[in-house]
């Protein structure tokens, strides 16, 4: 058989073809790695019945989920009550037809037991998990008191008289969390009302469960935890896991007079008793989270304070350790 001899030109052409093939494969892998796998919209601390424009704020969150064709919608607690006014707001929430999830906030059980509230909101339990695509999502319950001997669940506002005992994840739940994480091979993202990094009194014990699972798996398996409660916004990394505080959709609680008479008419301040001690946002706040094989992109809403703004009432840029901000900053997480 007469074989065609290799030449420098044919070798060069072959090398170029091989290089282009490798580059194309690399580009394909890169494209697949950055392709959105799951997108969800998250909001926190709407307090929809306690602000004058609660319905409008809820509609904005629902419209965002619909507009972006989100895979699911989740709120991180302090949402609505179960009375008739709350039911009307829940019909707004139902305007998003996809899966919707709830986290127990402390104010959600100001008038109810956990059993009553979870049943009224059609939640699978006070803590639970679910899968979507390549990801495993875990919802925790920090509405528990501990006096050094006994764990007591929040119920009908009982936590208000025991401020030093609040914000615990109970042992039963910790044990469940340990087994729930170990039972999945998917990357894990957590939701809680009280932050695991700062607010939970036994947050270190919760973080140890998360970090231990990453050590057991030998990879970044638990990657992100989102929380609310403090009406603030920040992102930090502890033990290789990213923790992000999702700001309230509605306002920051200041806890002292904020010259609200310059913000709202007298009838509004009288009807909504939180307003004189709070500072509202000009826009509803929420975030869109896009998950890929490479990481997460969090796109937040930027707003301003309804005047008078913090410096006009003698406030600085934080309340304790929490930033005083009217926005949810964009963030990116790599894994």
Spans of features found by a protein language model:
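Short, well-ordered beta-to-alpha junction loops that form the rim of enzyme active sites
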Residues: 142, 191-196, 229, 301-302
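Active-site glycine-centered loops adjacent to acidic/histidine catalytic or metal-binding residues
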Residues: 45, 77-78, 105-106, 193, ...
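Hydrophobic beta-strand anchors of alpha/beta hydrolase catalytic cores
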Residues: 40, 73, 137, 188-189
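N-terminal active-site segment of His-dependent metallophosphoesterases
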Residues: 28-88
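A short C-terminal boundary segment appended to hydrolase-like catalytic domains
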Residues: 268-335
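Short acidic, glycine-rich surface-loop motifs adjacent to enzyme active sites
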Residues: 179-198
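Extended active-site neighborhood of metal-dependent phosphoesterases/phosphodiesterases
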Residues: 85-183, 205-222, 232-280, 285-290
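Bacterial N-terminal signal peptides that target proteins for export
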Residues: 2-18
């Amino acid at each position: 058989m007469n074989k065609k001899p290799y030449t420098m030109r044919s070798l060069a052409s072959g090398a170029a073809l091989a290089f282009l093939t490798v580059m194309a494969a690399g580009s394909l892998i890169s494209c697949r790695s950055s392709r959105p796998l799951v997108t969800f919209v998250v909001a926190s601390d709407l307090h929809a019945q306690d602000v004058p424009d609660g319905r409008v704020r809820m509609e904005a969150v629902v419209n965002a989920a619909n507009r972006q064709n989100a895979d699911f919608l989740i709120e991180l607690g302090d949402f609505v009550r179960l009375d008739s006014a709350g039911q009307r707001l829940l019909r707004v929430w139902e305007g998003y037809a996809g899966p919707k999830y709830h986290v127990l906030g402390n104010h959600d059980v100001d008038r109810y037991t956990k059993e009553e509230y979870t049943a009224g909101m059609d939640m699978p339990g006070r803590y639970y998990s679910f899968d979507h695509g390549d990801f495993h999502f875990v919802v925790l319950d920090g509405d528990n008191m501990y006096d050094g001997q006994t764990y007591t669940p929040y119920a009908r506002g009982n936590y208000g008289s025991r401020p030093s005992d609040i914000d615990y994840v109970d042992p039963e739940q910790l044990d469940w969390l340990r087994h729930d994480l170990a039972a999945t091979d998917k990357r894990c993202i957590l939701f809680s009302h009280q932050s695991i990094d700062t607010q939970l009194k036994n947050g270190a014990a919760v973080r140890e469960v998360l970090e231990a699972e990453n050590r057991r798996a030998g990879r970044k398996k638990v990657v992100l935890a989102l929380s609310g409660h403090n009406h603030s916004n920040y992102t930090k990394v502890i033990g290789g896991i990213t923790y992000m505080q999702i700001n309230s959709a509605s306002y920051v609680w200041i806890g002292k007079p904020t010259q609200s008479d310059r913000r709202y008419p007298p009838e509004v301040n009288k009807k909504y008793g939180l307003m004189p001690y709070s500072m509202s946002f000009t826009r509803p706040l929420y975030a869109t989270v896009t998950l890929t094989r490479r990481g997460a992109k969090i796109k937040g809403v930027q707003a301003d304070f309804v005047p008078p703004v913090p410096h006009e009432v003698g406030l600085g840029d934080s309340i304790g350790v929490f930033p005083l901000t009217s926005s949810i900053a964009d963030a990116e997480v790599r894994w």
